[in-house]
Amino acid sequence: MASRKEGSGAAGGGFGSAKGKGKAAAAGDSAVKQVQIDGLVVLKIIKHYQEEGQGNEVVQGVLLGLVVDDRLEITNCFPFPQHTEDDADFDEVQYQMEMMRSLRHVNIDHLHVGWYQSTYYGSFVTRALLDSQFSYQHAIEESVVLIYDPIKTAQGSLSLKAYRLTPKLMEVCKEKDFSPEALKKANIAYENMFEEVPIVIKNSYLINVMLWELEKKSAVADRHELLSLASSNHLGKSLQLLMDRVDEMSQDIVKYNTYLRNVSKQQQQKHQYQQRRQQENIQRQSRGEPPLPEEDINKLFKPPQPPPRMESLLIAGQINTYCQNIKEFNAQNLGKLFMAQALQDYNN
């Protein structure tokens, strides 16, 4: 069970699978092709962040539902309560079990299908999230993690994405070997660590009718304010976070290059040692003396420990996420500039 710290979630190892009438996925294929979320679940996640989320502190919770064929239906959720390290008596597993037992008593879907987490400017590609999602998927194959971005949502566009670990990454995590050779053999790169699952938000017919009536009653206001450029604080913060991750990547590259230099240096030392031994044996043979006894060269020259490369892959994935966010932000603002210029030219 993963501890609930920033960027982590509680694993679902102690709960039963949510598989309903769906069939098991074939080896190497994703068990979930689509995520269907009730509108009530989306509102609960947003409400949870508004009540307890502050700054870069994340909020997390449990997703409940069931699996039908290759579709994961999320019908309910409940939050993890905020607590500090001083709350030594708080038991997350017991809390989750009591919540799910209470939901079962009132005939609400109580099967564990994943977890959700808020993010701060897209900062969610972390080792804590990787470990938590691996625990979920290892226990319940169909589990997903929902990433909610409150900053993008506040700008007028709901940002809610579902992710799963790819089968390749699941195998690597099971082996717990994150050496450069193991990741290269598994062909793991930051592009194929996570897979995004399409999301469909479903509402009841009555809610859809109510939304349609509200849309009809809403007064038509001046829409020119929609062309206002977004705050530059968003771009500045994203660039600052991007530079921080680039610095971390640079430090990891220096460590890896140091490891490669040490390996090369040791190979040269081993080669020189073997040549000296060979020349000395030739001289001893010419003098009629027995050759030197065989020695385990690996004991004399212990290979340097390779640095784990998983952190570098996660940093690269986070850098890619920041770049995509900056790209979307700039594309929206450039579009607004062109539209504003066209309107100004038209009015003139």
Swiss-Prot record:
One of its GO terms (biological process) is translational initiation. Signal peptide: none annotated. Keywords: Cytoplasm, Initiation factor, Protein biosynthesis. Residues 35-169 form the MPN domain. Residues 267-285 have a biased composition (Low complexity). It comes from the Eukaryota. InterPro entries: eIF3h (IPR027524), eIF3h_C (IPR045810), JAMM/MPN+_dom (IPR000555), JAMM_MPN+_peptidase_M67A (IPR050242), MPN (IPR037518). One of its GO terms (molecular function) is metallopeptidase activity. Residues 267-311 are annotated as: Disordered. Its main location: cytoplasm. Component of the eukaryotic translation initiation factor 3 (eIF-3) complex, which is involved in protein synthesis of a specialized repertoire of mRNAs and, together with other initiation factors, stimulates binding of mRNA and methionyl-tRNAi to the 40S ribosome. The eIF-3 complex specifically targets and initiates translation of a subset of mRNAs involved in cell proliferation. Belongs to the eIF-3 subunit H family. This is Eukaryotic translation initiation factor 3 subunit H. It comes from Taeniopygia guttata (Zebra finch).
